[in-house]
């Protein structure tokens, strides 16, 4: 916030319009696709990577065995996806927009995480209003304690 830099996520500052699109896509739980050996992807509720051996990767492509290149690491349960959305969203200084959560999961995060939010609010680590759940200045300094509630 000095010299025109904006504190837009827990560990980054930028000039307006120069925020990391990659990081923000991760914090917003957007899907991404990785191409090539050792590349990672996230689609719907599945995280996977491609095999790391470049020669094996190329051989599978040449033989038309593309599925042999993919390794599934995790298929998330909905409750895990909801918790992750909170954890990642709280990395952003703007926090989690309640209506965005409702649109994605058709649930109210204030009700769904009422116990966690009450505890964190009582400890002055988060602020909750009608539109947003976000870290307080104290919560920014102690963010790991906040995120632990959603792991």
Where are these regions (language model features)?
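Short, amphipathic alpha-helical interaction segments positioned at domain boundaries
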Residues: 138-151
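Short amphipathic alpha-helical interaction segments
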Residues: 106-121
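Minor-groove-contacting beta-hairpin "wing" of winged helix-turn-helix DNA-binding domains
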Residues: 132-136
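Short secondary-structure transition/capping segments
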Residues: 19-23, 123-124, 141
């Amino acid at each position: 916030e000095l010299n025109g830099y904006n504190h837009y996520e827990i560990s980054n500052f930028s000039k307006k319009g120069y925020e990391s699109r990659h990081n923000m896509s991760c914090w917003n739980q957007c899907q991404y696709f990785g191409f090539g050996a050792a590349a990672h992807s996230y689609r719907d509720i599945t995280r996977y990577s491609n095999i790391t051996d470049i020669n094996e990767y190329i051989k599978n492509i040449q033989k038309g065995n593309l599925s042999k290149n993919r390794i599934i690491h995790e298929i998330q349960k909905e409750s895990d996806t909801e918790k992750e959305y909170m954890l990642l969203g709280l990395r952003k200084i703007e926090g989690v927009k309640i209506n965005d959560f409702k649109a994605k999961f058709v649930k109210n995060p204030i009700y769904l995480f009422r116990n966690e939010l009450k505890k964190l609010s009582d400890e002055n680590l988060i602020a909750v209003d009608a539109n947003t759940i976000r870290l307080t200045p104290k919560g920014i300094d102690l963010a790991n304690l906040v995120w632990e509630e959603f792991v």
